[in-house]
Amino acid sequence: MNLKKALRKKKKQVRELEGYRDKLIEYDNHLDTLGERNSYSKTDPGATFMRMKEDAMKNGQTKPGYNLQIGTENQFITDFRLFPNPTDTLTLIPFFHSFQYRYNRLPNICVADSGYGSEENYRFMQENGIEAFIKYNYFHKEQRPRYTPNPFHAESLHYNAQEDYYVCPMGQHMNRIGTKRDKTASGYITESARYKAKRCEGCPLRGSCFKARGNRIIEVNHRLNQYKRQARERLLSEEGIKHRGRRCIEPEAVFGQMKYNMTYRRFRHVGEDKVTMDFAFFAIAFNIKKMCAKLIKEGKGFITVAKYMFMGLFITRYNWNIATCCQMHEEKAA
């Protein structure tokens, strides 16, 4: 009797181990599909859950999607690429590699918003001879008429570059005590110098300067500050003002045409390869349509314009048929 109980117990343990084995294989497959991302969609493993700009419920709901990056020139789409990560900071350098693969060269000038302003991106563009007109995170705040810098922030303290020390608001020297290294999500190593004050106890400005215990310690990334100074000089120059003015009517106008005038708000296929093909067709049709409008404005011949219009209408109609079918299926499902 005891032998039968022991045998049943062993069989039960074997079944449990087999179930654990199957689950372990399933979890390994999920991790392989996930890669370096934090999430993925079951219906489209290539898509990542992101917070979209169109949030009807205003609750930060995440939806599966792709981060589409485009390059434009005179409102023509020159290049595009899809990324699984929601932040724009990590997309600039891979986008440059995609541009180089397509055109066998890198662009001479890059104009972008503050979402791309990181030390890694600034350094890449400087080393590759790209003139960067890219804002950093608080550039717009500095340009406000009533902006006054906080005298207690590390950026506002006087720095002696020869002897490598800072001077606090009370005139005390803050000597360097070491270097802090951090690794970004892309693997880039940033270095920040650490400076410490000697006697903060009893200082009348301590309540406004900092509230932690002990003496104040600041961390300064000198390389990033140098890149920001160079970016500020470029952005405030005459050429920089011209590029900043065109920034609003270049990629933003293209996205506005796509979403609102051409109702292209969602991809109609599943999988990164098919989604790339989807947008490639759209980009071709968009550029042809733009070229037709430009030729008509310049007074070109009817036959030349008709050729471009026929090609654009064919591709746009193909995409429109797909969109109509998808909409019908969604209505039936609802």
Predicted ranges, named:
Residues M1-A334:
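Anion-binding and metal-coordination hotspots
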